[in-house]
């Protein structure tokens, strides 16, 4: 398969009097020919890459199949490109994966919808290879193509393909076939539908677990397209077979089928047909099956019916919370708030809370972390009084957990508790723990506390905040971790927005300015960052009297990093100075001279940032 990329011979025009001035139209034609030749050469290169020994080049070429097909034209794309691709099935898996993904995109380049079935041949072969990822992509692409077909093509081309795969000698083809039954089921007549149900049932009973796993995945979708009659006579029996399969890898997939069936049945039918299988799966001998039930429990409850949940499933959920496997308890802990919505307050207090108290002290840190992340969801359900009485002690205990993720998860959801019990009570109850966590050895915990502080500021008031939390906020500026120092500067800006610029001047800025004289250059650097970050929240007079002199004073610092950050800070300050008449003259009198001096600095980085800031400063015009 080749593309003719040889240059075309230009048409020669014979003229008696040839003007020495080039004809623009002729030049346009020449350029067009040249561009066309370049395009053909590019396509030829792509075709060569399809056969190249370098795997990555073959992958790249497969990603450009539509370009190749467009250049070849419909006939050659059908008769040459697709057969060539079909012959490439023995390639590396990464090439085949891209090929399986790109083949459906060729349908617009084949010359009409009647040629779409041509794409089935290579995809059928891809659906039978050993690599599961490639097979899954091929099945996805086959479903895509089937959706583009008319009913005649589905019956005459697609259905025979599925039958061949379903009856294939190798389990790989049979596993792929399972995922193709639902896509065209409704387009078939009753006789063909019955044939497909029988074929699918054979796959459900296949001797190979991998095939049965595929049918378990596919039955969920098939349950959504069969008639009500066949849901009862066909889907439910197959579900029960799979739910009692001897392989746990098959059984764990059936919870999704149960949900799909429950969505189509009424509450009474769900009670009669699905309740016992659900309970059986929830106490399955394999922990992976119980884990799947626990992780989907709220979704099951949403579909199976509220009355059934309250009457039949409370104890089932409690058993999952007490499961002997940590992974199951972790999954169940994540479902606590969602399941609690189906239960009354008495049930929560009598049945769930004892389990939750045990989980707070669970030996598995992941269980405690999952509980910490979701326990706050009980607050809106229990209300203020019961939250204070029953949940606050558990929050405090989790805040003191030795595992940092547990502490982080509680902090991340304090806002939900705050909405129920109010910030005053929350701060009084949790402030000692918050103060302790502010010095936590894990920097991520300290970061979470910093980000929560502004939410406490307004409700606590200035006096309480200054007395209990101000020193803490200032101490973070000297933290050994950069992310903490950065968050601390943003925190001070937010606090200034809450308490006002005068508060910042009297309490914060004076302490920041003292850091400019610290022997440790990191403190001096933090001074620049903090003042620059806070600028937007400060008044022009404070910038003029405190911020600018401090920044200018550091322009002669012996550390180059300090000096070029001074230049960057002055660049940031310039717009703020320009906005007010009382400070606009400082640009020419103070900022520009300082920057001019820095442009002659011996350090290249300092000169660069100073020059950039100087250009910006000189462009600024005082506002009138």
Predicted feature locations:
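Extended, low-complexity, acidic/polar intrinsically disordered regions
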Residues: 1-624
